[in-house]
Amino acid sequence: MRLFLSLPVLVVVLSMVLEGPAPAQGAPDVSSALDKLKEFGNTLEDKAWEVINRIKQSEFPAKTRDWFSETFRKVKEKLKINS
């Protein structure tokens, strides 16, 4: 008797599993995926500009530029002396 009850239950469960997800649970809409991608791109752009502006405002680029200028000037002077 148990076998007669468990087989129909098993068939119903198996048919529900094989039927697949409901349309609301299916793949998300393409436009929503594109909106999420656009939002991610905008966020990434904002963060990149923030980092670039922070680097421009720091004194590291100025010190680096001065160091390269000074080093280049010294090399130029040494080449003039040796010539």
UniProtKB/Swiss-Prot annotation:
Signal peptide: 1-26
Localization terms from the record: Secreted
UniProt cross-references to Pfam families, sorted A to Z: ApoC-I
GO molecular function: fatty acid binding; phospholipase inhibitor activity
One term under GO cellular component: very-low-density lipoprotein particle
Keywords from the named record: Lipid transport, Lipoprotein, Secreted, Signal, Transport
GO biological process: cholesterol efflux; cholesterol metabolic process; chylomicron remnant clearance; lipoprotein metabolic process; negative regulation of cholesterol transport; negative regulation of fatty acid biosynthetic process; negative regulation of lipid catabolic process; negative regulation of phosphatidylcholine catabolic process
Top-rank taxon, per record: Eukaryota
Family: Belongs to the apolipoprotein C1 family.
Annotated function: Inhibitor of lipoprotein binding to the low density lipoprotein (LDL) receptor, LDL receptor-related protein, and very low density lipoprotein (VLDL) receptor. Associates with high density lipoproteins (HDL) and the triacylglycerol-rich lipoproteins in the plasma and makes up about 10% of the protein of the VLDL and 2% of that of HDL. Appears to interfere directly with fatty acid uptake and is also the major plasma inhibitor of cholesteryl ester transfer protein (CETP). Binds free fatty acids and reduces their intracellular esterification.
Additional facts recorded: Apolipoprotein C-I is present in acidic (APOC1A) and basic (APOC1B) forms in P.paniscus, P.abelii and P.troglodytes and perhaps also in baboons and macaques. The two genes for ApoC-I arose through a duplication process that occurred after the divergence of New World monkeys from the human lineage. In human, the acidic form has become a pseudogene sometime between the divergence of bonobos and chimpanzees from the human lineage and the appearance of the Denisovans. Pseudogenization resulted when the codon for the penultimate amino acid in the signal sequence was changed to a stop codon.
PANTHER family associated with the record: APOLIPOPROTEIN C-I (PTHR16565:SF2)
Protein's UniProt name: Apolipoprotein C-I, basic form
GN (gene name): APOC1B
